[in-house]
Amino acid sequence: MLSKEIKFGEEARRALERGVDTLANAVKVTLGPKGRNVVLDRKFGSPTITNDGVTIARDIDLKDPWENLGCQLVKEVAIKTNDVAGDGTTTATLLAQAMIKEGLKNVAAGANPMIMRRGIDQAVKAVVDEIKTLSKPVESRDSIAQVAAISADDPEIGQLIADAMEKVGRDGVITVEESQSVGTSLEVVEGMNFDRGYISPYMITNTEKMEAVLEDPYILISDKKISSIGEVLPVLEKVVQTGKPMLLIAEEVEGEALATLVVNKLRGTFNCVAVKAPAFGERRKAMLEDIAILTNGQVASEELGVKMENVSLDMLGKARQIVIKKDETIIVDGAGSEQAIRDRSANIKRQLEETESEYDREKLQERLAKLSGGVAVIQVGAATETELKERKHRIEDALAATKAAVEEGIVSGGGVTLINAIKAIEKIEAQGDELTGINLVKKAMEEPLRQIANNAGIEGSVVVEKVKEAETGIGYNALTGVYESMIAAGIIDPAKVTRSAVQNAASISAMVLTTEAVVSELPGEDEMKGMGAGGMGGMGGMGGMM
């Protein structure tokens, strides 16, 4: 069993602070338009070059167990902010470092951390309310492009994301994929798509593109395995009489059933394409139901009391066109009623709010977007693998930041909103250690702007004082060296990003300040023996595998 060591009081807090500083100092050099990059070593493959706070934070683990605890705490700030808002991780880390540094000074001087915490909470509430007041809704295409361009530090990416959002709507799915070419492009897939293609290549209608295109088809949706043609014969005969093609979605189509469909297709008697149902288990049932609602059909499921032999034409779904590729099916313009689709979307949104699982949230988001129509794919290209990874990462970040901006609006960027929020903090009436907690947050609000200026090679404190004296919204443009209106200059941040950064930083800082003991594991005696020079002698023959 591993032994534990405990550190108390000031010694414990200082060890945590050293860990916080190590991580924050590595992350904060990336802040602002003139921020630097950080190179991350990889055991396999090429190193990663990035200026993304959360990517750097995730990669840092410290040797000293006490310092590592502080490092992990502030890493949590970056990860939580990234999960909620998709950006602002460097700002959050920097704010946490500033609050912890200032707070520990006061605790060492005799302030009561529990009362200070109350002051911190009050100040954060005032800042959050001020951010809401200052935020402006994002409505125009240009604002969306601006937010994305700032996050990715590339106007071309900004335009690409704005195009994607314009085409698939704000709830639409936008995915980022690696491309084989050097350039970055946008491809929009209209309608609902799922990652299952034709079961047999004999079903294709366009040999050049290797795809099957069905115009105005019927859609039979089933959750069972179909191996006998007798099961589906009654409904097939009804469809043949209409002269229309058909898409058959089932768990599996095999044996006699598949052979019969292929022979009829080759003879030109009947055009039917079979595809496997998407997803698995409960998610498959939900997705089949989504397809049914989108196409105004019903799922032929014995669980729902619908037997295959009893399926009539009015139970089949319809769409204007269906394109079936090797591993993808796209349903364009399904015949489902708008009201039914809206109700289904509302139901998925409710599930989204309730779920705790990140994976479930991602899958529900995908389903929601597929229902609301349209999937945009940004194909990222670059000359080298290292550049490709870095570029893809920037686009994913920009996409998350843009979605956050659409949700809660935008505020002035460049650390200006936090400086402007200081006035709101000053209005709070308090005294004693509570006031100390409030002042600690007030001082931390200056830190992002100071760091942006420092990274640009300018004296940060001078810039902070000038911006404090200027009107609301006026800040320092680190790229041009000019003091101007941030929003007019296109320097903007999503309000959600700024809000999350402040809340998460304050939460972790309050925890560090109120820590009185830190417990860490020490290597056990057996482990220590094993680590001796002779302990691993018998494994010398494996040297070649390293």
From Swiss-Prot:
InterPro entries: Chaperonin_Cpn60_CS (IPR018370), Cpn60/GroEL (IPR001844), Cpn60/GroEL/TCP-1 (IPR002423), GroEL-like_apical_dom_sf (IPR027409), GROEL-like_equatorial_sf (IPR027413), TCP-1-like_intermed_sf (IPR027410). Signal peptide: none annotated. Its EC number is 5.6.1.7. It is an enzyme of class 5 (isomerase). Disulfide bonds: none annotated. It is found in: Cytoplasm. One of its GO terms (cellular component) is cytoplasm. GO terms for molecular function: ATP binding; ATP-dependent protein folding chaperone; isomerase activity; unfolded protein binding. Its main location: cytoplasm. ATP binds at T30, L31, G32, P33, D87, G88, T89, T90, T91, G414, N477, A478, L479, D493. It catalyses: ATP + H2O + a folded polypeptide = ADP + phosphate + an unfolded polypeptide. One of its GO terms (biological process) is protein refolding. Keywords: ATP-binding, Chaperone, Cytoplasm, Isomerase, Nucleotide-binding. Belongs to the chaperonin (HSP60) family. Forms a cylinder of 14 subunits composed of two heptameric rings stacked back-to-back. Interacts with the co-chaperonin GroES. Together with its co-chaperonin GroES, plays an essential role in assisting protein folding. The GroEL-GroES system forms a nano-cage that allows encapsulation of the non-native substrate proteins and provides a physical environment optimized to promote and accelerate protein folding. This is Chaperonin GroEL. It comes from Syntrophomonas wolfei subsp. wolfei (strain DSM 2245B / Goettingen). The gene is groEL.
